[in-house]
C-alpha cells in the first residue's frame, strides 16, 4: 500500500489520524472520505465501534449474519443520524458507490430482500458523520493532522476494526509503519 499524495484527496480515500491528533473522537481514527469538493468534505469514522444492547430495535437483523453488521461512531456531527455503508449491489440504484463494492446510503429495504437465506452483505451502521468546511480539511492535511491512504472493501469491513489505525499505517510502510507502534498513552512507554 502506498501513501496517496495530497492531490488525491477525494471520495473513497482514507484519512488516517496522525499520532499528533491526541484525545477526542479523532484520536487514532480512520475516516472514509465520502465526499470532497471545494465546498467541504464529509466522511465516516470506521474504527470507533459502538456496542449496542438491542441492535434489532435499530436494524432488522433477521436475514443477516450478525457478525457482518457493525455499529460505529461515524463522527461528532448529527450523532442521532444513521449512515449506512454496505456491500450490497442490490441497492446500488439508491446508493452511492464510494469505492469498489462499497456503497453509502440507500434505505434498509434490501435487508428484507432475498428472504429465506442469510445475506452475505457486510454493513456498517454509522451514528453521525465527520464534516469539514471548504478548505478546512486541506488545511488540516497540510498541518500534518491526517495521512492519506487508499481504501478497499477489505479495510473498511475488517474483522479487527480496533487494529485498523495501526494496520493501515503498517501497510503504508516506511515512517508510517514506525508510527503505528507508538503507544496511545506515551506515559506507558
Curated annotation (Swiss-Prot):
Gene Ontology CC terms, in alphabetical order: cytosol
Family as reported in the entry's similarity comment: Belongs to the UPF0301 (AlgH) family.
Cited InterPro entries: AlgH-like
UniProt-recorded name of the protein: UPF0301 protein CTL0463
Amino acid at each position: 500500500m502506498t501513501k496517496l499524495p495530497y492531490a488525491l484527496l477525494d471520495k473513497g480515500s482514507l484519512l488516517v489520524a496522525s499520532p499528533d491528533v491526541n484525545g477526542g473522537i479523532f484520536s487514532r481514527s480512520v475516516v472514509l472520505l465520502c465526499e470532497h469538493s471545494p465546498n467541504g468534505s464529509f466522511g465516516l469514522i470506521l474504527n470507533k465501534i459502538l456496542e449496542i444492547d438491542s441492535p434489532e430495535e435499530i436494524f432488522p437483523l433477521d436475514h443477516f449474519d450478525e457478525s457482518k453488521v457493525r455499529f460505529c461512531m461515524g463522527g461528532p456531527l448529527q450523532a442521532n443520524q444513521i449512515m449506512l455503508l454496505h456491500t450490497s449491489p442490490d441497492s446500488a440504484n439508491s446508493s452511492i458507490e464510494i469505492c469498489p463494492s462499497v456503497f453509502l446510503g440507500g434505505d434498509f429495504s434490501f435487508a428484507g430482500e432475498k428472504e429465506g437465506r442469510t445475506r452475505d452483505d457486510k454493513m456498517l451502521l454509522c451514528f453521525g458523520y465527520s464534516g469539514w468546511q471548504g478548505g478546512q480539511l486541506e488545511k488540516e492535511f497540510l498541518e500534518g493532522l491526517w495521512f492519506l491512504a487508499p481504501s478497499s472493501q477489505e479495510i473498511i469491513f475488517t474483522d479487527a476494526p480496533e487494529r485498523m489505525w495501526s494496520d493501515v499505517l503498517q501497510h503504508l510502510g516506511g515512517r508510517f509503519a514506525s508510527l503505528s507502534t507508538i503507544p496511545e498513552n506515551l506515559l506507558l512507554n
